[in-house]
Amino acid sequence: LPYTYNRKCRDLTSDEMSENKDFVIRFKSKIKGKSILEDIVQGKVEIENNTIEDFVILRKDGSPTYNLSASVDDHLMNMTHIIRGDDHKINTFKQIQIYEAMKWDKPLFAHIPLIHTIDGKKLSKRDKASTLDDYSKIGIMPDALRNYLLRLGWSYKDLSLIHI
């Protein structure tokens, strides 16, 4: 099982907090109820709030973590739609709590299936072919790649080819 923070510092007194020299800043997540994500692709997705840990938003050195940075950046850039892989869904629930705490309008979220290599690992920019030019160099035709990407996680009736 993955590590989950046990919330031991969630309700420290001011005196207890001042005793700690090394500390991080955590977001105090909701514990009761459910959070609901209206995902553009997957529809209504629910999660029990007690499964979302009090997550770190500032490291010991004061630098922000991904969830805080992404939320602030997306808000300041007036992002209306966030499209990302399924593996970031738990981050979305954390970011929604940040948006709600800051009283910001939330963008719309879409989570799409990951693309995997022939070995079953998720495709990464560190893999050999990661740009359109790379695929062109190994002989993948643009229309074939476009058709493949269009059909990932979706199909229309029984069509194997979609003409754009």
Predicted regions and their residues:
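Glycine-rich and small/hydrophobic secondary-structure elements
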Residues: 133, 138-140
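Active-site cores that bind ATP or allylic diphosphates and position pyrophosphate for catalysis
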Residues: 1-125, 131, 156
